Amino acid sequence: MPRLGRFAINAKNYFLTYPRCPLTKEDVLEQLLALSTPVNKKFIRVCRELHEDGEPHLHVLLQFEGKLQTKNERFFDLVSPTRSTHYHPNIQAAKSASDVKSYMDKDGDVLDHGSFQVDGRSARGGKQSANDAYAEALNSGSKLQALNILREKAPKDYILQFHNLNCNLSRIFADDVPPYVSPYSLSAFDKVPSYISSWASENVRDSCAPERPISIVIEGDSRTGKTMWARALGPHNYLCGHLDLNSKIYSNDAWYNVIDDVDPHYLKHFKEFMGAQRDWQSNVKYGKPTHIKGGIPTIFLCNPGPKSSYKEYLDEPDNTALKLWASKNAEFYTLKEPLFSSVDQGATQGCQEASNSTLSN
């Protein structure tokens, strides 16, 4: 057995406390980095803390690539750069680097060097609670912070379920999409056929809207102004390429929907959208079903062709009944020329057709 009072520590993680130490965090880090050790230093965190008496204390977490054995209790002593004063720390082997790091996070005045080495243990007893780790991640305020917390405190889930975590956290911490502002007024579209203008004036309204409005399908070549015109009518939901109806994407306060370049063969909720149906639900990926208030018309925009045209889709032999239903719930028009006379709108239209905004003004 070792003699009483003999100093010896053999550990990968060291927790040092320097009481009444006025050195800056930068001075401490510089001196610790200069220490010659047989194993590489992987991570150093220096934390400055003011106690109630106003005296500064310094805490240090040192992580090594492998175990560092030392029998020299003066090994981690620091020296003042301006005088011959030495500062001796209390030295402990950190049972849980994650707990020590979290403790130092509370004070906030920290300086880090290197990459923190994840420790799945907790000094509070065994493995940390998964619920605690996930609760902290949800309260972190950002996707990146949440992922970093789970990397440290739920490393198994981080490795095995990263694809799900990444996707779910992207949705949870999705930024609010700013309202769309049309670069053109409706008057800029000076070649809109009268029957399309009439449809818009009768069906796209905030007040006095029809109880069961009629939708419209507009088919035409690219760069004819379909999308720009449709998005200039008022506040709307813009769905392009695929449908995502979660509450951060789809608004029940919109006047109408614009469904742009969605293959009708794979259009989810075809009848609900085209028929302006009210009070229906949609299953949201990685979330609970969302309630759609509905009762608003939809503008369907498409190009000619078998995987785009709604007319060609409804002409398929298996869709006879659906075609009859659609003829009573939507108007179908084919554009022969652009909806504008200015060349500039055509260039902008090409960019717009590639975008995917949401509720827009």
Curated annotation (Swiss-Prot):
Active site, UniProt feature: 103 (for dna cleavage activity)
Annotated localization: Host nucleus
Gene Ontology cellular-component annotations: host cell nucleus
Primary location recorded for the protein, binned into one broad class: host cell
S-adenosyl-L-methionine among keywords: no
Cofactor note as given: Divalent metal cations, possibly Mg(2+) or Mn(2+).
Pfam families to which the protein is assigned, alphabetical: Gemini_AL1, Gemini_AL1_M
InterPro entries hit by this protein: CRESS_DNA_REP, Gemini_AL1_CLV, Gemini_AL1_REP, Gemini_AL1_REP_central
Domain of life the protein comes from: Viruses
Residue numbers spanned by region Binding to RBR1: 143-153
GO terms (BP aspect): biological process involved in interaction with host; DNA replication
UniProt xrefs under Gene3D superfamilies: 3.40.1310.20
Motif RCR-1, chain ranges: 15-18
Extent of motif RCR-2: 57-59
Enzyme Commission code(s) on record: 2.7.7.-, 3.1.21.-
Assigned keywords, A-Z: ATP-binding, Covalent protein-DNA linkage, DNA replication, DNA-binding, Endonuclease, Helicase, Host nucleus, Host-virus interaction, Hydrolase, Metal-binding, Multifunctional enzyme, Nuclease, Nucleotide-binding, Nucleotidyltransferase, Transferase
Positions contributing to a divalent metal cation binding: 49, 57, 59, 107
Obligatory cofactor(s): Mg(2+); Mn(2+)
Complex formation: Homooligomer. Interacts with the replication enhancer protein (REn). Interacts with host retinoblastoma-related protein 1 (RBR1), and may thereby induce the transcription of host replicative enzymes even if the cell is not dividing anymore. Interacts with host PCNA. Interacts with host SCE1 protein. Binds to host RAD54 protein to ensure geminiviral replication.
Family named by the database record: Belongs to the geminiviridae Rep protein family.
Protein name, per record: Replication-associated protein
Organism: Mungbean yellow mosaic virus (strain Vigna)
Lineage: Viruses, Monodnaviria, Shotokuvirae, Cressdnaviricota, Repensiviricetes
